[in-house]
Amino acid sequence: MKKKLIAIAVGAAMAVPAVAMADISIYGRAHVSVDFLDDGADYSETNLSSNSSRLGFKGDHQINPNLNAFFQIEQEVLFGSDNGSSFNTRDTFVGLSGNFGAAQIGRFDSPFKVARGPANLFGDQVGDMRNLTRVGDARFDERYDNTIQYTTPDFGGFNAKLAYSVHEGQSVQLDDEGDALDSDSMSMSLNYAGGPLEASLAYEQAEEDTSRGERDGIRAAAAYKLTDAFKLVGFYQTIEYDDADASDLERDLWTSDVYGVGGEYKIASNTALKAMWMTRDADADDADADMWVVGVEHKLDKAVRVYANYAVLDNDDAIRMNPWSQGRSANPSSSDDAFGEQASAFTVGLRYDF
C-alpha cells in the first residue's frame, strides 16, 4: 500500500509541471550596440549599450471555447554591467479574452505609447523618436502601474484600446490634509491595419498628483507601403503641460508639438535603408530641436539582425537634448556646455530575438 501511494505521489509530481507548462513560452531579446556619442561640447566617448534587452514568460489557457485566460511576465535585462538593478519590470499582466475582446490588469505600455509603432523606424536605437517625444516632465511614452485595459475585437482592421491607471505606487496615497491624491491616468487609442496602411490615433491624460504633474496629449502615427520595397511613415504629437506647481517657464518648456516623416527602402529581401527627420516645437523661446537619422539594417535570419545608424540633433540656445537618451543603457546626459549645440551619435548594433 505504501509503495502504491509513493508511486502515485511521484507520478502526480511529474505530471503537474507538464500540465502547467503546456501553454507557457519563454521569449526574449538580446540587443546590444557599440556607440560613439558626441554632445557637441565636452562629452565625446565610446560606449557599449544594452538596448531594452528583455526576458519574458507568457502563456494562455482555454477556460471554455468562448473564454481564455492569458498572462505575461517580462523583465528588462542589462548586458555588460552589474549595477544591482539588472532586472526591471516591463510589460507584466494577466487577463481574459474572448469574443468580447480582451481585458487585462497589470503594468504595461499605455495605448498612447504603443501608438507610435507605425512610424517607429529606430526603436531602442540611436535616433529613437522618443528623444524628442519623451522629454522632461511632459513625457507620455510610459508604462503605468495598476492599469486596467480593454481591447475591442477586430472590426475590419480597426480596434480600440482604453486603459485606466487607478493610481501610482502600491496604494492610493493621502495628502497632508488626509485627502486622496489624484494620481490616476487615462489612455486610449484607435488603430487600423489593413492592406498597405497601418495607423494609430491616441489620447492620454495624467492627473495633477501624478509624479510628473498634470498633462495631456494627442498622438498620430501612420505607415503606408507605396510598393513592396518602399514604406513611407509620418508622425505627429502635441503635449500640453499644466502642472500647477511648475513655473511658467517650465510649462512652456515642456508644452510642445513634435512631428516628422521618414521612410524605409528594401534594397534586398533582408536589407533595408532607413531615414527619419523630426522636429520639436516648444512654447518656450529658443527651446526647439531638430533630429535626423539614417541607417542600414541587415537581417541575418528571422531571429538575428545587425545595423548601423548615424543621428544628429540640433538644439536651440535654451535646450541641450541628444539622440541617444531613450531605450538604451548608455544614455549619458549632455554636458552643461551643450546648450545650443549639435549632438551626434554613430552606432553599430546586434539584435537577437528568441
Predicted regions and their residues:
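Transmembrane beta-strands of outer-membrane beta-barrel pores
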Residues: 32-38, 75-79, 109-111, 164-168, ...
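Outer-membrane beta-barrel "beta-signal"
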Residues: 265, 294, 298-300, 312, ...
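Gram-negative bacterial Sec-dependent N-terminal signal peptides
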Residues: 1-23
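Repeated loop/turn-to-beta-strand initiation elements of outer-membrane beta-barrel proteins
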Residues: 24, 63-69, 100-104, 157-160, ...
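Detector for outer-membrane/organellar transmembrane beta-barrel domains
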Residues: 181-293, 298
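Outer-membrane beta-barrel architecture
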Residues: 11, 56-58, 93-95, 149-151, ...
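Residues that define the transmembrane beta-barrel architecture of outer-membrane proteins
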Residues: 43-53, 87-90, 142-146, 182-186, ...
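Outer membrane beta-barrel
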Residues: 23-35, 44-169, 182, 191-198
